[in-house]
Amino acid sequence: ALFEYLSDSANLDTIIFVRPEEKNSALLAENVIHGDVASANKWKIKADPVDDSGATIYKSFTSVIGNMKKGATVDLDITLSDGVKVEVSGGDNAGLACGTMDENASLAVSLSNSSLDISGKSNAGTFVGKMSAGATLNIDKCSTLTDVNISANNAGGLVGSAENAEINVGEGVTLTMTGSVTGSVTVGGLFGSYTYSKANEKTFDISKFSGMKMALACSSGDTADSAAVGSVFGLLTNSADIAKISITGTANDIITSNFDGTVRAGFYGGIVGRYSANALSSELALSDIIVNVTGSCNALDFGSLIGKIGDNSKAYVSVKNTTISIKNSTSSQNNYGGLVGYADQAFIDVGGKVTVTAADVSANQSVGGIVGKFNKNGVVRLGGETNLSGFYPKD
């Protein structure tokens, strides 16, 4: 790294990297600490493709910033010149902008022109590997990203794992990204794993992410049969006793769940791979969502919204004004649900106008238009208009 420790109060002119040496360290700073600064300083980073050998691939750095310490705040502008490809690897937590954000750290990112391979041991995401409690990521500007490939235990299109963290997308910015996300434990189009434990309501507006069309896959290995894969969250945990998590969209934005079922995973969900909650007094509310499921969903439990609601999870899940279309071949080894693949002690509340379309549905154990299988004490309440006329089993 150029700096071992760097204060967020530092004023930096544009730093142009021609080509870093190949070693497992951060590009700019291993650690950024919070100094005497009221607002974030803008740091401009540019990667040019020219060196003596003519090489254009930046290899083996773990992130631009390795670790943002508690309370640190940075505004990072990253420009990769045409022809530059970045390979971020070697760290426990890997992300192009930052590997690890500690509590209450704040990072604003603008990203221009990018072809990325990002791999971490534990957590990896395009922007950040791991976000701790209260950390905030603001994506102020982002070019269309193509050929982005992410892999780790917990892999996410944006962030590998996060706890009580915030992601904000700038006015007029809609993220558009293609490539692949592959994980051995959790895989998410946005977050590999996300945990929420606060009492106040948390809302995720996923309309800003309708351009995220990453192919989601489980890596082979001993953990495959318990891996959770979802187009927004691989694993979503509500650990509060009374808290509402809302996932909302708009009528014009379609969430594409593009599953690569080469390796059988534990759970596939069109929005959430696996959901876990502490109490029925906490709610997961999904509303105004359009989901198109494509690819081969080779999983033990498949649901077009949630693959599995975890064992011993007393979960309350509401679904309202949602349209689901499962367009390509989908196979589930155990349970297949129009909304939820498998649920233990859950209350599924369906209201408004909900439509599920899927042809040639099959599973080894159970198939259901709403829930594939309840283990025990499960309840489904139907209100409004629920249309399952286009959901039918294989002959």
Annotated model-derived regions:
Residues 1-395:
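Surface-exposed loop/turn motifs in large extracellular/passenger domains
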